[in-house]
Amino acid sequence: MTRLLMSFLLLPACLGLSNSAWAVWGKFISTGAGTSIGTPSCAQVATSHVVCAIRSGKYAIMVNEFNGTTWGSWTTLAGAVSSDPSCTSDGSGNVMCAATDITGKLRWSLFNGATWTTPALVTAALYSEPSCANYTVGQVLCVARNATGGLAYTLYNGATWSAVKNLATIAISHPSCTTDNNGGVICSLYTKAGATLANRYANGAWEGFLNLTGIAGGEPDCTSMNQNGNVVCFAKGYASGVYGNRFFGGAWAATRWGGYGAMSGTFNDNAGCTSHTAGLLVCGATAVTDNAFYANVWGGSSWSGWSKIGGSGTGSPACAPLGTGKVVCVMKALNNLITSVVGP
């Protein structure tokens, strides 16, 4: 069967890691004195306004704002957490950030563009960090592993959270969820033998797990292309390469996925990707060879190839759109401080 993704992600080996920039990136700047022990998470509030959250060395969530040029100061939210945060727009000008509390409950706070709500708890028994995504306007779905290795999920309707429900599966990794910007949320996870499972939440229900096969390691990363329900899920392969699998929207069926395609290069962790313009993507990753930040841009018909932007970091970067055709990407530097760069 012809794979839908052949023209989208299968790259010639010669692309590799390029030293030439695909477009204009700025210089790396410090985000301030906040130190992180995990992976950051960022989300757009408004044009040229992004918030990011990290888990500090004191097991608290710290948050900061970027105005398109400069960062504010890292602020600690109340409460102790055992996981990295997950942040998402709620589709109505707010950003929701949530993490697993040290009690296993879901700890969350909402940012309205100026202030954060007092962190509160949702009764749950979570066994991984959550992944939260905008469902419909003002609504956010959060999903995490549960005690039996399946998934636990809860929906915020703009005022209250639903009771946590469970979804049977075998999740080896925590899930990665994203809005499809078409009335649904798509989540992927790794299951036995490194295969990828994906499920879509739409019309108030899950549509069923699809086995996308593959042999993945690390953690998945899914992002909307902000176009006709298209979503791409990225994975780090067992040989440290990054692979992508695109869902082309429409009916929830395995035939609507293109299959994993290699993006070349070798990286410390999975790529962090976001859509900066409808139908286009920016991905960032830190290379095994020099720990530098590399970027790869999907321009609508082909990838630019990995271009060395600079810096020195570890783990997966987090990228968020600025609403200007550019993105801000943050990564944990080798000294555990967070640095950022804007492009392309």
Where are the language model's segments positioned?
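Positively charged n-region of N-terminal signal peptides that target proteins for export
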Residues: M1-L4
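Bacterial N-terminal signal peptides
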Residues: S7-G16
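A structural motif
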Residues: W22-P344
